Amino acid sequence: MESGSDYSRRVFLGLTAAGAAGVAAGCSADATSGSGASPHTTAHKAASHHNVTENSLAGDPNWEIRHLGAPMAIVGYAGQASVLPGQPITLYVSTTARSFKVNAYRMGWYNGDRARLLWKSGSVKGHRQRAASMIHPTNTVQAVWGESLTVPTDDWPEGSYLLRLDAETGAQRYVPVTVRSASTTGRVVIKNGTATWQAYNTWGGYDLYNGPGGIADYSNRSLAVSLDRPYDANGAYMFLYHERKTIELAERMGLPLAYVTSMEIDAEPHLLDGASALITAGHDEYWSPPERAHVTAARNAGMNIAFMGANTMFRRTRIDGTRLGERRLVICYKTSYLQDPMYGKDNSLVTSDWREPPNPDPESSLTGTLYESNPTDADYIVASPDSWLFAKTGVHKGSKFTGLVGIEYDRVNPVYPVQRPIEVLSHSPLQCRGVNSYSDMAYYTHKSGAGVLDTGTMRWVACCNDLRLFGLTRKTSEFTRQVTSNVLHAFADGPAAAKYPARDNLGSMHEWPGDPIAGQHNLWPPVVL
């Protein structure tokens, strides 16, 4: 999203932060167990069997936060965004309570409980750690704290975890951690978008959008944000709102899953070798050049990709280290790219938006669609009802799902690079910033055999959560869950193009009066560099 123009989106994310735990509590899923896919490797079979076994175990419905308490009643962060099974996690905790405990939950299906308790600590002595400090000139907030405890992960399955900090006073916060996969061969890869989580993390008063003055303080924003600090709000709202529901569905279906974060994809060129699919959920805006290159190479080798949101890969980042280790700093200068130390040295690494100078490389060459703007609130309109993605939904051309498009949206834009053949599955008229436009859900197939889907709306995963804001209905939730299930089933079975080729229909999608594509109109106001 464009810096300095994000009021509606920040309000939306604030609603998310306040209600993420409650939203999670109200979720339901309609997908049936069993992947329906034909396993194509030994790794695929083994991972699928393990996932079915894991989710048959008893869950714990008491994983949710019941009481946040005061902002600093208890907060913490992990010294590792991810670990391999068996590697310890170091926790840094600050609390006003005399003691606290930690419960570690693996997120999944677990017969509707949606989490399993893997470990719990004894009572740990609590104390308030020092105030946050600032690194200049990038306005990088860091919490230079002493270690509070080490969490063992022996025998922990790979997956997305929430470590819940419970102060003796009743205050609670989450610390998200990924127990990552060493290999992704034959598996559907779930990506935890740690770079984007950190970009929106306002803990300490700064994120990549604003300084302590809030929405009017763009000029004082951070130019680099550190993982060496807690997350704001409940500690995990980006995960709970934008990612958890997709994980729940995939786990319930018994698919062979692997788990990684932004940081591993950035670091490891061959991490995705042999993967069936990559799933990025909800909001995955911040990508580094190595991450994009590694995902593109995997697509070119036949890996399917599902972008289950909008605004994906809009921002170009660099990943660097902090005092606690490698890949714990997300750098993004945005419109201040002339200040980026890489400017004039290696412009391919300058952290302007992907489509902007000094080295424009629009994200649509991978995503198929292109992020257009925000805010909007519109109905989702089906354009290609006989697509395999809409199986078991009963839709017809023009079927409408109220409020599904928002707050940010993508569109197929032929002014920029577009992969062909591409099939526009929904073509939803909307207004944004006083301009008429469309949101598109689109699917393309690549010569490698890969299938790539972009849902075109940031509310997709939220709708799977039975969210009732924005006019969303149970009918919409059932629709999004079924389509997501169809995608996961098909993509788990390997390169999708042969069985599910895209039927190019881009030429039948017409502009309407005031359309920004027809008028080559930029929806964003001018920004002073």
Task: Spell out what each predicted region is.
Residues 1-7, 18-25:
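N-terminal secretory signal peptides
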Residues 23-42:
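C-terminal region of N-terminal signal peptides and the immediate post-cleavage residues
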Residues 129-140, 148-151, 156-157, 235-321, ...:
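Helical hinge/lid and interdomain linker segments adjacent to catalytic or ligand-binding clefts
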